[in-house]
């Protein structure tokens, strides 16, 4: 049965317009993105297939073009559309962060970090550069790979902060394995970088660990800064 034959209050588009996007399931939201199904399968059916195939929305959104296009009914055009939607979400959250004190919007910071780092298959170290009012100047992915005191160079972090005239920084890195807990190496690295930046009067306000799924962990909230 086609979606147009469903009761009106069960159709994803009509449900969104009458009750808001929060009322829709993951599959219904994804079906609106897909717009149409294929022979014998509605857009909702295809959406459920995608979620079942990848397990989570995070894995779906971080799929490669070849993985995405391998699903019946999908293709490179849909993959490009999905990446565009994700980038729009990242940019919208970046505008929010740039317009206000980051400490007034901690959940926006977490949401943005999940979008920027949570889907990456490799460990990435990101530096958020803040001005004296704690508004975002820029965010830079500085290092990739296994992060240790020997792979993250303090001089590069200090140089970046000075070049951007930052008054403070927030660090973030992802754990592709899914673990949200800071490791002892993470704590040692943070102390090492904090000491280096203190020499040039730049504050380290926080360090977030971003898991593949779930809520990023704040060092500051744990008393580790």
UniProtKB/Swiss-Prot annotation:
Belongs to the UPF0758 family. Zn(2+) binds at residues 173, 175, 186. Pfam families: RadC, UPF0758_N. This is UPF0758 protein azo1137. One of its GO terms (molecular function) is metal ion binding. A motif (JAMM motif) lies at residues 173-186. Gene3D superfamilies: 5' to 3' exonuclease, C-terminal subdomain, Cytidine Deaminase, domain 2. InterPro entries: MPN, RadC_JAB, RuvA_2-like, UPF0758, UPF0758_CS, UPF0758_N. GO terms for biological process: proteolysis. Keywords: Hydrolase, Metal-binding, Metalloprotease, Protease, Zinc. Residues 102-225 form the MPN domain. NCBIfam families: PRK00024.1, radc. It comes from the Bacteria.
């Amino acid at each position: 049965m086609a979606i147009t034959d469903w009761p009106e209050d069960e159709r994803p588009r009509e449900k969104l317009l009458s009750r808001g996007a929060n009322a829709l399931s993951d599959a219904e939201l994804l079906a609106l993105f897909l717009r149409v199904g294929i022979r014998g399968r509605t857009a909702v059916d295809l959406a459920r297939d995608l979620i079942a195939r990848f397990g989570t929305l995070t894995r779906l959104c971080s799929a490669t073009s070849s993985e995405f296009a391998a699903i019946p009914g999908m293709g490179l055009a849909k993959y490009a559309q999905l990446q565009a939607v994700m980038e729009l979400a990242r940019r919208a959250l970046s505008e929010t962060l740039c317009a206000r004190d980051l400490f007034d919007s901690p959940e926006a910071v977490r949401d943005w970090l999940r979008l920027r780092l949570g889907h990456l298959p490799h460990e990435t170290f990101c530096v958020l550069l803040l001005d004296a009012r704690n508004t975002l100047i820029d965010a830079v992915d500085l290092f990739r790979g296994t992060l240790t005191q020997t792979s993250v160079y303090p001089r590069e972090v200090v140089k970046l902060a000075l070049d951007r005239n930052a008054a403070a920084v927030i660090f973030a890195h992802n754990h592709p394995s899914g673990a949200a807990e800071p490791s002892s190496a993470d704590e040692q690295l943070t102390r090492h970088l904090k000491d280096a930046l203190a020499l040039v009067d730049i504050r380290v306000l926080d360090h977030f660990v971003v898991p593949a799924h779930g809520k990023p962990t704040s060092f500051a909230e744990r008393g580790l800064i």
